A protein has these predicted regions:
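Amphipathic alpha-helical hairpins
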Residues: 1-165
Length: 165
């Protein structure tokens, strides 16, 4: 990695990490989660968010274009750690209902990671005067916040249903 000596370089570095996160989610993580999930409402929510995530990738790629940079993803140990933890635990969960609850929690953790990253990048983009980029990142942020609301609602419903059995 080259030395980072100015805010713009730091911003591009953060974008590379976020591109990795969104690509990994769209290509691998969300489709796998959708296959795992039994609850139809939750499954549909993940399917919809997969499509949103593909748009997030396009928005980040557009951001690179606006900056005159090549969109190169940079590995995110944060998302890889969440995925590894999920894989470690999920194989030990015997009940489909409990697995859905666990998957909802895993999805919420990922949304929090994405929300924090987008908020940080928006602050930097605003400081750099990159208004068009701010708009693209805010679009992604708004969808991540909405996805978090949905997954929290699903998690609450799943816990209530499982506890009532």
């Amino acid at each position: 990695m080259a030395a980072i000596t100015e805010p713009r370089q730091l911003f591009v570095n953060e974008l590379k990490g976020m591109l990795y996160v969104e690509q990994r989610l769209a290509q691998d993580v969300l489709p796998q989660l959708e296959r795992e999930i039994q609850n139809n409402e939750f499954k549909q929510s993940i399917r919809e968010h997969t499509q949103e995530t593909k748009r997030h990738v396009a928005n980040i790629e557009r951001t690179f274009e606006l900056l005159g940079e090549e969109p190169k993803p940079d590995k995110s140990h944060a998302v890889d750690g969440l995925v590894a933890q999920h894989e470690k635990v999920v194989k030990n969960i015997q009940s489909p209902e409990l697995r859905d609850i666990f998957d909802a929690g895993a999805a919420a953790k990922t949304e929090h990671l994405e929300i924090a990253a987008y908020e940080s990048m928006i602050t930097t983009a605003e400081s750099l005067g990159e208004n068009e980029i701010v708009s693209l990142l805010e679009e992604n942020l708004d969808e991540e916040k909405e996805a978090l609301k949905k997954v929290k609602k699903v998690a609450e419903q799943l816990v209530r249903e499982t506890a009532a059995v």
